[in-house]
């Protein structure tokens, strides 16, 4: 099938537009006669910058306006960072493809310190993620963790203005924007296990658009899809959102998936970990199995306590 025109809905931040243009380029290469446009949009998540995401409704704030454009036909597909996509999509929407994953890890960015472990007592680290906060507080209790919102450029400017001694950002975003030079170190899994889907792009469509599944199929990366499916199944089983300090990271080797999961308290006092392996075709079941291990260790009670504190 050779489409004549496709419209991509995207947030207007530099990173989101890079992602949309990346998919635009892939589609133009696949379908040279197709006109591929980008519809830039401002979302509620882009507008609310004075509160942490966990307190204003979560990362779904970054996708609702894009979904409305899909629903009313202004756009054919929307490009998202998968880690920003709620675990349960609204009825009538579907993820048609998940692209090959870039760097899934977090990056340490500082103008003063080369490594996280070099930071002295009371040094201020910025992050908007409860997932990162829980892990950093557990491993580095001497550091002060403070909220950090805004797009990548805004966050870097806050660091450069001296509001923070260091900040933690997704490595993939910095690399996509050619800001690799700002990265002092990539955090290990033991320092900061990634969020479900981190580093991967997802393509969302209105579920009834059966014509698009075949069109977008070449953009899907099988291994990444299996890994992200396992990660999202884990998070979904535990009610994961950005209001919960939850991490899930899956790797694949010779068709075998290894999934690592984590649930913590934002103050770092409790961090639960679990892992398991399964063939790639059982990705969803693997996610649920690791979620059960975490639940058996008290993850649901911990998540309930965190949500009660947040509310």
Swiss-Prot record:
It catalyses: 4 porphobilinogen + H2O = hydroxymethylbilane + 4 NH4(+). The lineage of its organism: Bacteria, Pseudomonadati, Pseudomonadota, Betaproteobacteria, Neisseriales. This is Porphobilinogen deaminase. The keyword Transferase applies. One of its GO terms (biological process) is protoporphyrinogen IX biosynthetic process. Belongs to the HMBS family. The porphobilinogen subunits are added to the dipyrromethane group. Binds 1 dipyrromethane group covalently. Its EC number is 2.5.1.61. The keyword Nucleus does not apply. It comes from the Bacteria. The gene is hemC. Its cofactor is dipyrromethane. PROSITE patterns: PORPHOBILINOGEN_DEAM. NCBIfam families: hemC (TIGR00212). Tetrapolymerization of the monopyrrole PBG into the hydroxymethylbilane pre-uroporphyrinogen in several discrete steps. Monomer. It comes from Neisseria meningitidis serogroup A / serotype 4A (strain DSM 15465 / Z2491). The modification S-(dipyrrolylmethanemethyl)cysteine is found at residue 242. Keywords: Porphyrin biosynthesis, Transferase. One of its GO terms (molecular function) is hydroxymethylbilane synthase activity. GO terms for cellular component: cytoplasm. Pathway: Porphyrin-containing compound metabolism; protoporphyrin-IX biosynthesis; coproporphyrinogen-III from 5-aminolevulinate: step 2/4.
């Amino acid at each position: 099938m050779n489409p004549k025109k496709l419209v991509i809905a995207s947030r207007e931040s530099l990173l989101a537009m890079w992602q949309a243009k990346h998919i635009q380029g892939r589609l133009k290469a696949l379908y040279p006669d197709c006109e591929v446009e980008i519809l830039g949009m401002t979302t509620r998540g882009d507008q609310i910058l004075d509160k942490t995401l966990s307190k204003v409704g979560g990362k779904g704030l970054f996708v609702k306006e894009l979904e409305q454009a899909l629903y009313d036909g202004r756009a054919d597909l929307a490009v998202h960072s998968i880690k920003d996509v709620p675990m349960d999509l609204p009825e009538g929407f579907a993820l048609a493809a998940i692209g090959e994953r870039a760097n899934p890890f977090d990056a340490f960015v500082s103008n003063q310190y080369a490594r996280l472990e070099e930071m002295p007592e009371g040094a201020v680290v910025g992050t908007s993620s409860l997932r990162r906060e829980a892990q950093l507080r557990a491993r580095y209790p001497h550091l002060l963790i403070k909220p950090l919102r805004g797009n990548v450029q805004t966050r870097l400017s806050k660091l450069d203005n001296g509001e923070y001694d260091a900040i933690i950002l997704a490595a993939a975003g910095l690399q996509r924007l050619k800001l690799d030079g700002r990265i002092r170190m990539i955090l290990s899994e033991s320092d900061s296990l990634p969020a479900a889907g981190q580093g991967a792009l997802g393509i969302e469509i209105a579920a009834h658009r059966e014509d698009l599944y075949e069109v977008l199929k070449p953009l899907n990366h099988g291994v990444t899809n299996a890994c992200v499916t396992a990660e999202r199944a884990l998070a979904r089983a535990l009610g994961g959102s950005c209001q919960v300090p939850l991490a899930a990271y899956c790797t694949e080797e010779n068709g075998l998936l290894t999934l690592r999961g984590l649930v913590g308290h934002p103050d770092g006092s409790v961090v639960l970990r679990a892992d398991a392996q399964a063939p790639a075709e059982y990705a969803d079941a693997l996610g649920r199995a690791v979620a059960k291990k975490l639940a058996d260790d008290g993850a649901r009670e911990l998540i309930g306590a965190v949500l009660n504190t947040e509310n």
